[in-house]
Amino acid sequence: LVPERELIVGRMDGVIYGAAQLQKPSRNNEAQSFAVQLMHLFVAPYARGHGLARMILRKAEERARALGFHVINLDVRASQTSAIALYEAEGYQRWGTHPVYARVKGQIIQGHYFYKALK
């Protein structure tokens, strides 16, 4: 639907329980043409614990490689410790922290930035 985005869905028994998006760089951004942004990786709370997030992440990496990208970038709230553990276990490197990344229920939350070089 949107040329700059790729949607990856995770299913169990034919039902969609999670998804992620790959956002390609804009066409006029030649300097970043080798990198794609992973966004909105989500698994429904009642479907967690079955490895679906890892499967979606790996499918996103596979699709990024197929599209010719060499790097995946992502960012995540510091409070999302399960997601951070997944990214680190899958080889993503944290390269920075934003001290005022998000506001959740009136609280300021830090955010972390990660990247992974695709082989």
Please annotate each region the language model reported.
Residues 32, 50-51, 108:
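Non-catalytic, surface-exposed connector residues within folded enzymatic/regulatory domains
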Residues 1-46, 57-59, 63, 100, ...:
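Acetyl-CoA-dependent GNAT
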Residues 44-46, 50, 78-79:
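Active-site acidic-Proline motif in GNAT/NAT acetyltransferases
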Residues 57, 64-75:
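Conserved GNAT acetyl-CoA-binding A-motif
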Residues 14, 18, 51-53, 91:
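Conserved phosphate-binding and hydrolysis motifs of nucleotide-dependent enzymes
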Residues 70-73, 77-84, 89-93, 100-119:
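C-terminal "cap" of GNAT-fold acetyltransferases
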Residues 49, 62-66, 93:
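Conserved amphipathic alpha-helical interaction elements at protein-protein interfaces in regulatory
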